[in-house]
């Protein structure tokens, strides 16, 4: 069993910021678990600028902003495991996670920080009846196709609804 003072589930901007703040407060044993292949979360697909003015004093794109935080995480010696899915958290702070390299991980934590961000859910996950027509996708999926994967999902776009819940 692995032992850490803090396990952060989620390696996006909030997860990295939480880990860095914990390190700044004197916590040495920190592990970030991220299900994507890299740290950075949603920032990786936000190719527009506007990030970093308050924290770094300059305007950065999402990936540039993420890279700065990843650099700080590395400089501070904060451990992380990418491509790792958190499966379960027990009442006594044991985190079960898995990845291709380590298999099943059992991690004892003194504290756990949940910083998993958000994911758009298809209407099936929201219990909305019906089937989705070919080519209908969420805004986040379209953004990922264009900004990360380099695909053009279509030449004509209709946005029916975009909601942000705060």
Feature annotation, model-predicted:
Residues 2-14, 156-160:
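Beta1/beta-strand and adjacent pyrophosphate-binding region of the FAD-binding site
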Residues 3-5, 27, 83, 92, ...:
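Phosphate-coordination loops involved in phosphoryl transfer and adenosine-cofactor binding
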Residues 22:
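Aromatic pocket-lining residues of Rossmann-like dinucleotide-binding sites
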Residues 25-42:
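Glycine-rich FAD pyrophosphate-binding loop
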Residues 44-81, 134-135, 142:
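N-terminal glycine-rich dinucleotide-binding loop that anchors FAD/FMN and/or NAD(P) in oxidoreductases
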Residues 64-119:
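Feature captures the FAD/FMN-dependent oxidoreductase FAD-binding
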Residues 118-139:
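Glycine-rich beta-alpha-beta "Rossmann" dinucleotide-binding loop(s) and their flanking helix/strand
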Residues 164-166:
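Conserved small/polar residues in nucleotide/adenosyl-binding loops
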């Amino acid at each position: 069993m692995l032992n850490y003072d803090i396990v952060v589930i989620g390696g996006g901007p909030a997860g990295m910021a939480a880990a860095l703040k914990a390190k700044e407060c004197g916590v040495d044993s920190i592990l970030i678990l991220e299900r994507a292949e890299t740290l950075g979360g949603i920032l990786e697909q936000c190719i527009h600028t506007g990030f970093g003015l308050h924290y770094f004093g300059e305007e950065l794109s999402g990936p540039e902003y993420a890279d700065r935080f990843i650099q700080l995480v590395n400089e501070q010696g904060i451990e992380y495991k990418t491509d790792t899915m958190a499966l379960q958290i027990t009442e006594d702070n044991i985190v079960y996670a898995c990845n291709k390299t380590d298999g099943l991980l059992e991690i004892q934590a003194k504290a756990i920080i949940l910083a998993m961000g958000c994911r758009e859910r298809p209407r099936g996950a929201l219990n909305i009846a019906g089937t989705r027509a070919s080519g209908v996708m969420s805004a986040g999926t379209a953004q990922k196709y264009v900004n990360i994967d380099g695909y053009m999902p279509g030449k004509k776009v209709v946005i029916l609804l975009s909601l942000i819940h705060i």
